[in-house]
């Protein structure tokens, strides 16, 4: 995302940015939109704010990236909206951006690592040379993160990032690009080529929790295992949760309480 644009946005008073939004500082589960300066139409995102939040109260934030072919609502639809339930229980604000579209890639250029014999989908836009759509996808995540942090006064030292499949690759990409932005990360069922990753760029993280289902027939669990070892060698506290009978799309939700526990235990800035 253009750094000058981020600086300019940070100087705009919140009262002006949200003046026309009837859901400004609303609690609960809501569908929201905002105007992205480079997108053809308003960009949607989904947000959950715990009932215990009130103006002036600081809470941590979890940014959740959906998988390819999905949208900002998909993470909330798994396991009877366990995402909102765990956020309420742990006292976290959760936001899920669209990322510019169902398969925007969040700016990542990594090639996916498939499981042996996987029925490979068409190439993901996230694995192609940089395009305007990819730039919008990346900046959408960062703008929604900033918008939410400004609106709800979140603890900026406790912003966490997680995602599944394409969202996992986006998580890994944004973690190494925006150093110091994230406290800890949670990639699931979406490794990148282990030898291609810049582990030295994520040593600032307080921790990483990787999740992968042992019945994932699309993404390589062996590649995830290799990434876990490389994270540990880089000195990052790393947990690996291998989900028994876990599938490509559902494993992350099956063990989500543990992911929130992990994030809650990793409190940056203290």
Residues of each region from the PLM?
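C-terminal catalytic histidine-bearing segment of alpha/beta-hydrolase fold enzymes
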Residues: 208-211, 217-270
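Serine-hydrolase catalytic machinery in alpha/beta-hydrolase-like enzymes
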Residues: 31, 38-44, 57-153
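Primarily recognizes the serine-hydrolase "nucleophile elbow" in alpha/beta-hydrolase
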Residues: 77-79, 146-153, 157-204
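Alpha/beta-hydrolase
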Residues: 65, 187-188, 243
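Bacterial N-terminal signal peptides
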Residues: 7-15
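Positively charged n-region of N-terminal signal peptides that target proteins for export
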Residues: 1-4
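Alpha/beta-hydrolase fold active-site loops
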Residues: 60, 92, 183, 206-207
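A domain-start/cap signature at the N-terminus of enzymes
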Residues: 17-61, 129, 137, 166, ...
């Amino acid at each position: 995302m253009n750094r000058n644009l981020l600086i300019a946005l940070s100087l705009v008073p919140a009262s002006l940015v949200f003046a026309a939004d009837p859901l400004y500082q609303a609690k609960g589960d809501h569908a929201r939109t905002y105007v992205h300066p480079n997108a053809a139409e308003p960009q949607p995102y989904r947000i959950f704010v715990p009932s215990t939040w009130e103006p002036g109260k600081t809470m941590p934030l979890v940014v959740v990236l959906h998988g390819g072919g999905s949208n900002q609502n998909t993470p909330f639809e798994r396991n009877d909206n366990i995402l909102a339930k765990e956020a309420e229980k742990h006292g976290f604000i959760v936001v899920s951006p669209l990322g510019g579209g169902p398969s925007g890639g969040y700016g990542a250029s990594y090639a996916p690592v498939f499981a042996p014999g996987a029925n490979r989908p068409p190439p993901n836009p996230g694995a192609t040379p940089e395009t305007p759509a990819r730039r919008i996808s990346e900046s959408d995540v960062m703008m929604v993160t900033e918008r939410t942090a400004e609106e709800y006064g979140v603890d900026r030292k406790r912003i966490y990032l997680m995602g599944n499949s394409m969202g996992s690759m986006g998580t890994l990409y944004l973690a190494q690009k925006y150093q110091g932005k994230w406290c800890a990360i949670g990639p699931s069922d979406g490794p990148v080529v282990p030898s291609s990753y810049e582990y030295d760029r994520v040593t600032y993280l307080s921790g990483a929790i990787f999740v992968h289902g042992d019945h994932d027939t699309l993404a390589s669990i062996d590649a995830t295992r290799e990434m876990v070892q490389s994270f540990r060698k880089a000195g990052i506290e790393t947990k690996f949760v291998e989900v028994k009978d876990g599938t490509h799309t559902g494993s992350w939700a099956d063990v989500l309480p543990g992911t929130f526990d992990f994030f809650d235990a990793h409190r940056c800035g203290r």
